[in-house]
Amino acid sequence: MAIEKLPPQLANQIAAGEVVERPASVIKELVENSLDAGATRVDIEIDKGGSKLIRIRDNGFGIPKQDLSLALSRHATSKLKSLDDLEAIMSFGFRGEALASISSVSRLTLTSRTETQAEAWQAKAEGTEMAVQILPAAHPVGTTIEAVDLFFNTPARRRFLKSDKTEFTHIDEWLKRIALVRRDIHFTLKHNGKSVRNYRPAMTEIQYLQRLGQVCGKAFAETCLHISCSHNDLTLSGYLQAPGAASGYCETQYFYVNGRLVKDRLVNHAVRQAFSEYAAGVSPGYVLMLELDPHQVDVNVHPAKHEVRFHQSRYVHDYILQALQSAMAQSSELGLEAQPEPTDESGAAFESNSTNSNVSSTSYSEPNTKPVAVNERPLTTTATSYNQGQSSYRTPLRPATHRADVELPSQSSLEAYASLLSRSSAEPASGKVVSNPHASAVSDASVKMPAVLADKYWVIVEEDSIRLLSIADVIKETARQQIQAKLAQGLVGQPLLMPVAVPVDDNWNEVIETREILLRKLGIELSIRLGQLIIKKVPPYLRDSQLAVLIPELLQWIRFEEPSDDALVHWLTTQASSRFTASAEAWLAFSTLDSSAKSALYNQSQELPWQQWMKESQSD
């Protein structure tokens, strides 16, 4: 049989087999075109599950009269001009197939008007006719597309459509998905003349939580954790079902890449792996939005654009994993039960009784460094902050030797604690009452942890004094003693789940060879391969650090000198100080300190002039 070129109408119908699967796919293509056209409102109207009528109306830029015919032809688009554009796609559509495919299997009417046109124009096309009629029409700025009698000319395809209810369910589900990621758009949906959905623009977080509740259910919206993190050119935001609220399989699983809803096994694996520590075998709900350089992701790998291919898939996987693990660990350590966390100017989080929202917020930030990393763990900035001075991922390799001034809590807060001493003996204050300030009974493991003030201090109430003991100082001293005891025998390195890779420097190979014994003593295992420094193992004290920055700084340091054990202990202590929390864990760690360290820390605590406050209060 001779090879012949297919007629345009037949070619369009073949293409429609991939693009137009059911009414929901028609609505997907048309609404995405509306969003690409800058619409802020999209109205969807369907009859009989979309098989009889699909009408999409938007207030976008519109299509000029001279482009109407071209818009209904194959491979005609305003989204791409060159191959470079294909490598960095940010729009939903880019192939120029949707309108041609839809018009080949339905009776399509396209009415549009641009802001510069005095009147609107209408284009009509039917599946059996390739000719397009252009007529004047009345229409505001924007576009309306009607697709009537879907698959009227392909009876076999029409027989495969499900019931009206089933087809409507697919449409409703797709609308929910797009409503979650495009919070700035007003979406409405009518079925058989009845208003079914009305998603108003969600410009504030409270409004978005209301939309989240509409789409995912009130239970999810009230118990989810807010995720917001950024690292280099990657930004992850959204909501994750709290471990305590998840069980079995949750159908609320939406993942977006640069605003495009995709299905990716890599993401599902990262979420399940992050959850395994808290609830093994659970597939939790999530609404996650990943933004990255469009050059780092290929969206042109699936006919319906449901899948993407990341250029650094392992990097993306581990980035999502670490972000979710950090969020859940933080919520667990702070004892959060889906409560919001307002932050002060330094980024420290405080407990709140706000009733505006039940979503726990977790945020991350990182300086603008440029390593090509495969596995990096972001450090939260809303964690319980007793190392308040740190505002980025890492601490300097050579921290300043002087101690920063500690900001005291407000006097009104302290006066509240002063009132503890005025209570009767029948109502003892929380904390340990001791007669000897140098007695180590205050740190007895059997003693209940004292009250915590501003996530920075323990309030130690004695017979005749109130003292503030810095949690940061306790954590630092605890880590220092542990590291000092273990460094003499050598630290044990822990393999990383995914090795970290950074571009290699010319002299690093020599440094690794000459300082091999020192690196082994620190529990750090490195190798160089294909121009990359591969970080394989680190001691537990460094696992929460930004390794892609920290290890190169370490190599630069030991290149010119061999640090003493004291210097190494000081460096490791600085990195490890963020591993603890202002909780019973830190208090228990305090009890492991020797008596001299406890006394030294106690002497550094700040005594409050509560008696003077009482006198001033009585005189007033």
Swiss-Prot record:
Stretches with biased composition (Polar residues): 378-394
Record GO terms (molecular function): ATP binding; ATP hydrolysis activity; ATP-dependent DNA damage sensor activity; mismatched DNA binding
GO CC term (a single one): mismatch repair complex
Biased composition (Low complexity): 352-365
Key words of the record: DNA damage, DNA repair
SUPFAM superfamilies with a match to the protein in the record: ATPase domain of HSP90 chaperone/DNA topoisomerase II/histidine kinase (SSF55874), DNA mismatch repair protein MutL (SSF118116), Ribosomal protein S5 domain 2-like (SSF54211)
Keyword DNA damage applies: yes
Stretches that traverse the bilayer: none
Domain of life where this protein originates: Bacteria
Disulphide connectivity of cysteines: none
Annotated segments matching region Disordered: 332-402
A Gene Ontology biological process term: mismatch repair
Keyword S-adenosyl-L-methionine tagged: no
PANTHER family linked: DNA MISMATCH REPAIR PROTEIN MLH, PMS, MUTL, DNA MISMATCH REPAIR PROTEIN MLH1
Function: This protein is involved in the repair of mismatches in DNA. It is required for dam-dependent methyl-directed DNA mismatch repair. May act as a 'molecular matchmaker', a protein that promotes the formation of a stable complex between two or more DNA-binding proteins in an ATP-dependent manner without itself being part of a final effector complex.
Family of the protein in this entry: Belongs to the DNA mismatch repair MutL/HexB family.
Protein name: DNA mismatch repair protein MutL
